[in-house]
């Protein structure tokens, strides 16, 4: 099988749950298959999807599948949209999506998703990192920053472009991925706070959301 994924931006429309207009049509314009979307709660729960559309609306922050035609999605504005591709000697074995904010990163959502992919038969895992807020724009309270440092790694401690304490989500994610023996295949490199093409709750109080969508195809 082959893994496919897409990181959307404003040009795909608002993909927030409950957004105005025909959300289903916007989804199907991206991938014409039933979506498993999640009621995200900034936790570490992972759902295993056995058929297209299964577990849609479940309270979780990650999903994995080894079934072709099942589209998995997470919605974000500044948190990290992460696609994980589980590989085997014969190709893609499974795929997963993760909503990785600072709480989920500290609670182990990435590690839980990697473990779920390995239970589905993945012998290797590669990460594809989507657009998210970067350290130069992510001002963070000192006490909360200390808690993330303790939960993740000192590498998350940084400074904004204007010199105040900041959280480096990217550095934290790279640390977690390396510890989980995951290869980082690529990083979009885009900061949602800086990019007018993306929604950002922090920078512009946007209520809209972009998405990471991943699925498997036969072939």
Task: Enumerate the language-model features and the residues they cover.
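Active-site microenvironment for binding and transforming phosphate-containing groups
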Residues: 1-219
